Structure formats: structure tokens, C-alpha cells
Amino acid sequence: MARRIRQWIGFLIMLAGLGLLAGPFLLGAREEKVQEQVVDTFYQDVKKAETEPAANETETREPQDPFYQAAKAYNESLLNGGQSAMTSRADVEQFALSAQDYGVSENVIGTIRIPRMEIELGLYLGANSENMAKGAAIFGMTSLPLGRESENAAIAGHRGWRGAPMFREIQKLQIDDPIYVTTPWQTLVYRVCEIRIVTPEDNSWCRIQPGRTLISLMTCHPYGQNYQRYIVFAELSPEDKPSEEAIRAENAASYDPSPRQITQIHADGTSDTVTVDPAAIRPDGSEYGAVLSNFVILAEDKMRIAAWIGAAVVALSGIWLTVQTLRDFKKGEKHHESE
């Protein structure tokens, strides 16, 4: 009896180990599914709006669309001095507009797709913790991406969240990489034009640059830490969104895996240049940085394989324990019969 109890205890311990092993993968898969649902819901809302046009609406929707007009007026208010009030974290967490007031299921104005990083996320209004747990988020008191002159939409994303990649591999982005932003009115193509590393207190990067049409991606840096911010600027390109085949072809052909030279701006305003290896998401220059970061990435990316291996080990162990238990049971019966 004692032996059988030990066997079942061992079996339960292995099941618990499998749960610990598979847990991060399952959580990550769940988070990615939630993000996919947000994107799908946005496209469904847009499709519904297109099939139910307003009575006074023209073919282009934009001039008469109330949401667009509100977004346009909001951007103009920022250009006329509205960003001067941006002084605290609370200012970027809230947003003056709500997409839900204009028929969008969640407070999402669109999606952002980055082929180099293999992600597409919902674009929430307001960079608060709730929104950033579900996708990318536009800072309050920064522009909405309408494709008009003198805009800078500051878009924040976690450097990975509960197993979902989000902006984790932002260091793979290189100059001229495309970024696609889809709103209820159009899909805009932006091209990466500059990359910086700044301090958390520096908010100059999210300010409007008159005459330029920008989006600015922001995430914590280095990976796994948050004492800096990694900023990627992308400028509006006049091109139309290409076909999926063309997107994949450009993504495969244009990648440069060599280290990048990135401008780093310090708290005192001075700057220098640091080397960032896109294959290693810790660019601090330490000897262990690349090895450590790549191990973390490998562990995260290979969690699916590890989960299956763990499941197989536990399944085989369970079968073996079951067989051993049955054998012991039969031996016990034979022993009683012989007595």
C-alpha cells in the first residue's frame, strides 16, 4: 500500500510539473487569441459601417463621418497648443475621444501591423494598463493617425506581455521597414525613418513635428527591464498598401541582420551612439547580454515544443505507473489467494 501511495504521489508531482511547464505557453496563446479577436472585431465594425452608410455620406466617407471629424478636430487642437498641457503620466493614460461613442465595439481606432515583427495589434485610445494589456495604445495628448500633415501618433506597447510578443522584438526594425496602420477610413503606410533610445522622463519624441506625418513606437528597454525607452519613428509614405505576397517578399528580401548604430539620449541632454544587435534583444554591450536574452527568447518561443515534450513524458510516466500499479495489485491478489 505504501509503495502504491508513493507512486501516485510521484504521478501527481509530474502532473504539477507539466502544469508549470505548459502554463506560460497556454497563457501566451490565450493572450494572442484575445489580441486576434480585438483585431477581428475592429474589422467587423468597419465592414458593418461600410454596409450601412449615413444618408448624407459620399463615397469617401471621411468628410461626413462624425468619428473622422471628431478625430480631425482633436488633432487640430493639439497642433494649436494642446500638447503643452502634457506634464504627467495621467495625461497619456486617458484620451479625449472614445471610439465606442462612434460605434466601435472597444475603444479601438484601428490596428497596427508590423511585418518585420510578425504582429498585428489593436490600437487603443489611451496608454493605460488595461489597454496595453490587450494591444498597442496611443498616448493621450498625441495625434491620431489620420495621414494628415503635422501629426505624431505616439504608440506604446509592452515588451512582451504574459507570453504574447507585442513589441518584444522591436529591435529587428530597421530604416525603411514598412508599418501599416488601418483606421475605419483607410490603411496608411509608414516607413521607419529614425530610431532612438531615451530616458523614461523624455517625452520630446512624442511631440508633433510641424510639417511631418509620423507615428512613434515606444516600448521599455532593455528587454526585461525598464530604465530606458526604445523609440522608432516612422513617416507616412505616399504608397498604397501592397498585396500580401509583396509584403512577404519585401520582408524576406530586405532584412539586414547586422548590428545597428542607434542614438542614445541621456537625461542631461547629451547623446552618444550604441550598438544594437537585432538578434539579441539586450543591447547593453555586456558580454552576457546577447546570450542571456537569446536564451530567454528561445525559452519563450520554444514553449510549445517544451509543453508537448513535457506532456509526452508525463503521459508515458502515467502509463508506466498505471502498469506498475496493476502489477502490484495482481501480485497482491495472488499473494492473498496463496494464503
Task: Locate each region found by the language model.
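Solvent-exposed, non-transmembrane regions of membrane-associated and secreted proteins
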Residues: 2-301, 321-335
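Selective detector of the "anchor" transmembrane alpha-helix that sits immediately C-terminal
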Residues: 302-326
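Solvent-exposed, low-complexity, intrinsically disordered
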Residues: 337-339
